[in-house]
Amino acid sequence: MKAEELRKLTDDELKDKLTELKKKLMNLRFQNAVGGLEKPSEIKATKRDIARILTILRERELSKAGGE
């Protein structure tokens, strides 16, 4: 998912997406440990999506604090 698409979402939607991606990452790690993961690169992509969301949430938090 691109950062541009994520920036269009509200904070609540981003937090929901973050929770969803963390669950997905946990499942991917479990599948990888068991040995049944077809695309291990999916773990890396999911971690990057999580990082993008956290970055956008932090940027918004800082812009709100700076505006006060």
Swiss-Prot record:
GO biological process entries: translation
Coiled-coil parts of chain: none
InterPro entries recorded: Ribosomal_protein_uL29 (IPR050063), Ribosomal_uL29 (IPR001854), Ribosomal_uL29_CS (IPR018254), Ribosomal_uL29_sf (IPR036049)
Keywords from the UniProt entry: Ribonucleoprotein, Ribosomal protein
Entry GO MF terms: structural constituent of ribosome
Signal peptide boundaries: none
Record-level GO cellular component terms: cytosolic large ribosomal subunit
Keyword Ribosomal protein: yes
Entries under SUPFAM superfamilies matching the protein: Ribosomal protein L29 (L29p) (SSF46561)
HAMAP family listed in its UniProt record: Ribosomal_uL29
NCBIfam families cross-referenced by the UniProt entry: L29
PANTHER family noted in UniProt: 60S RIBOSOMAL PROTEIN L35/50S RIBOSOMAL PROTEIN L29, LARGE RIBOSOMAL SUBUNIT PROTEIN UL29C
Family in the record: Belongs to the universal ribosomal protein uL29 family.
Protein name: Large ribosomal subunit protein uL29
Lineage: Bacteria, Pseudomonadati, Aquificota, Aquificia, Aquificales
